[in-house]
Amino acid sequence: MSPQDKLVIALPKGRILDEAMPLVRAAGILPEPAFDDPKSRLLRFGTNHPHIDIIRVRSFDVATFVAFGAAHLGVAGNDVLMEFDYPEIYAPLDLGIGACRLSVAEPDDLAASDDPRRWSHVRIATKYPEVTKRHFAARGVQAECVKLNGAMELAPSLGLCTRIVDLVSSGATLKANGLKEVEVLAEVTSRLIVNRAALKTRPDEMAGWIEAFRKACGG
């Protein structure tokens, strides 16, 4: 079978991968040994199914690989799905992993007297400009977003932006940087995502794997 004919599953690097792999294995997909080798520089891996490969990419890129058909299935947080809003993606299953929230945070001294309900214009550092703008536009608040890909917590102390929008889990990073969570935009978990075209061209195969992941989640 040529590489172009294989079913490709896109998985995110990092913490979510650790939570996703028990579900992937429970669904019956076992990657080759190099997948678990921290020294391996491979990004594409074979599995116990000769017609299935796994690729390991940045979390924000999983949705793009699936939307454009380079991968057929993937695991992505609904934060990423909301930001890109790809019509080519179908998300049939909440995997219940990677739980966190997308929140607004600001310096502790400002949060002590601030009221988010009174905001009319905000300048925000975030990796999620589209989600942020939509959220505040729905409240009639103008949001000026400065796009950053990391180290969001530095923005207020360096005068770049007064507030940030970022993923929050325990809140420990915010606290360590003198910031306080003041508003939640969305609760976030990771979803199984599917390319809609693949659903039409490989319906039985795709439906079978969706069901396998559903059972792996206890459904």
From Swiss-Prot:
Its EC number is 2.4.2.17. CDD domains: PBP2_HisGs. Keywords: Amino-acid biosynthesis, ATP-binding, Cytoplasm, Glycosyltransferase, Histidine biosynthesis, Nucleotide-binding, Transferase. SUPFAM superfamilies: Periplasmic binding protein-like II. It catalyses: 1-(5-phospho-beta-D-ribosyl)-ATP + diphosphate = 5-phospho-alpha-D-ribose 1-diphosphate + ATP. InterPro entries: ATP_PRibTrfase_cat, ATP_PRibTrfase_HisG, ATP_PRibTrfase_HisG_short. It comes from the Bacteria. Its main location: cytoplasm. Pathway: Amino-acid biosynthesis; L-histidine biosynthesis; L-histidine from 5-phospho-alpha-D-ribose 1-diphosphate: step 1/9. It is found in: Cytoplasm. GO terms for molecular function: ATP binding; ATP phosphoribosyltransferase activity. GO terms for cellular component: cytoplasm. The keyword Nucleotide-binding applies. It is an enzyme of class 2 (transferase). It holds the Pfam family HisG. Belongs to the ATP phosphoribosyltransferase family. Short subfamily. Lacks the C-terminal regulatory region which is replaced by HisZ. Heteromultimer composed of HisG and HisZ subunits. Catalyzes the condensation of ATP and 5-phosphoribose 1-diphosphate to form N'-(5'-phosphoribosyl)-ATP (PR-ATP). Has a crucial role in the pathway because the rate of histidine biosynthesis seems to be controlled primarily by regulation of HisG enzymatic activity. HAMAP family: HisG_Short. This is ATP phosphoribosyltransferase. The gene is hisG.
